[in-house]
A protein has these predicted regions:
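N-terminal "domain-start" segment that seeds a small globular fold
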Residues: 1-18
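Structural signal for short hydrophobic segments within the conserved structured cores
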Residues: 4-6, 54, 85-88
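Short active-site neighborhood of thiol/selenol oxidoreductases, capturing the structured segment around
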Residues: 18-30
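Hydrophobic heptad-repeat coiled-coil signature
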Residues: 32-35
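Non-catalytic, surface beta->alpha helical segment in thiol-disulfide oxidoreductase systems
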Residues: 80-105
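Structural signature of beta-strand start/N-cap positions in the alpha/beta core
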Residues: 23, 50-52, 81
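Thiol-based oxidoreductase modules, predominantly thioredoxin-like and allied folds used
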Residues: 8, 27, 39-63, 70
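N-terminal targeting signals for export/organelle localization
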Residues: 1-3, 44, 98-99
Length: 105
């Protein structure tokens, strides 16, 4: 099991995709209540499964949010081999997120 939580910027995003076969990216903001609610759940999943999570603060990295069509937060994007393959929008309980991520965790 590995637990990695990276804060990504426009400058570090591509390298993170290149360095991880599967990367789950949490697009969030510190003023977003549902984002704060889901954060500890993502920490639990990262600790229990073989998955790397990263965070993108949408206020600070608006270009990335725009590029990946993130208009609602939290939005979780699963990237596989550098490509977005799954989108989960909104805070969800742990068991639902685990089910959404099946095949990647």
């Amino acid at each position: 099991m590995r637990r990695t939580q990276m804060n990504l910027t426009n400058e570090t995003f591509s390298k993170a995709l290149d360095d991880n076969k599967v990367l789950i990216v949490d697009f969030w903001a510190d003023w977003c209540g549902p984002c704060l609610k889901v954060a500890p759940i993502l920490d639990e999943i990262a600790n229990e499964y073989n998955v790397t999570f990263a965070k993108v603060h949408v206020d600070e990295e608006q270009d990335l949010a725009y590029k990946y069509d993130v208009s609602t937060i939290p939005t979780l994007l699963v990237f596989e081999n550098g490509l977005p393959v799954k989108r989960v929008v909104g805070a969800q309980p742990k068991h639902k997120l685990v089910k959404e991520f099946e095949g990647w965790i």
